[in-house]
C-alpha cells in the first residue's frame, strides 16, 4: 500500500513520536496500538478522524503530517 502520502505520513509520525512508546502514544490519542503500528509500517492509510487527532496532539499542521509542507 505504499504511496507518497502513506510513506510521508509514516516518516513524519515516527519523527513526532520520537522516544515515546507506540503504546503510550496510542493511549494518548485514543487510537488502537495496532492501528498506529500499521501506520508506521505503511500498511494502512490514516483516516481523517485519526489524522486530526494526531495533528491536534502534536500541535502540527495536517499538511506537515501528510508531507505537503516541511
What residue ranges belong to the model's regions?
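A short, Lys/Arg-rich alpha-helix, primarily the initiator
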Residues: 1-24, 28
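Conserved hydrophobic/aromatic packing and binding residues within compact polymer-binding modules
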Residues: 13, 25-26, 36-39, 65
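Short, locally clustered residues in the helix-turn-helix/winged-helix DNA-binding domain
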Residues: 14, 41, 55
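Short, Lys/Arg-enriched C-terminal cap helix and immediately downstream tail that follows
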Residues: 16, 48-49
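Short coil turns linking two alpha-helices in DNA-binding domains
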Residues: 21, 32-35, 47, 61
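Recognition helix of helix-turn-helix/homeodomain-like DNA-binding domains
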Residues: 30-45, 68
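DNA major-groove recognition helix of helix-turn-helix/homeodomain DNA-binding modules
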Residues: 49-64
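Short amphipathic recognition helices of helix-turn-helix/homeodomain-type DNA-binding modules
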Residues: 64-70
Amino acid at each position: 500500500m505504499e504511496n507518497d502520502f502513506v510513506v510521508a505520513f509514516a516518516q513524519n509520525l515516527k519523527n513526532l513520536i520520537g522516544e515515546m512508546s507506540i503504546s503510550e502514544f496510542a493511549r494518548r490519542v485514543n487510537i488502537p496500538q495496532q492501528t498506529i503500528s500499521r501506520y508506521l509500517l505503511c500498511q494502512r492509510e490514516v483516516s481523517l478522524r485519526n489524522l486530526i487527532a494526531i495533528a491536534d496532539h502534536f500541535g502540527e499542521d495536517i499538511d506537515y503530517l501528510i508531507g505537503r509542507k516541511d
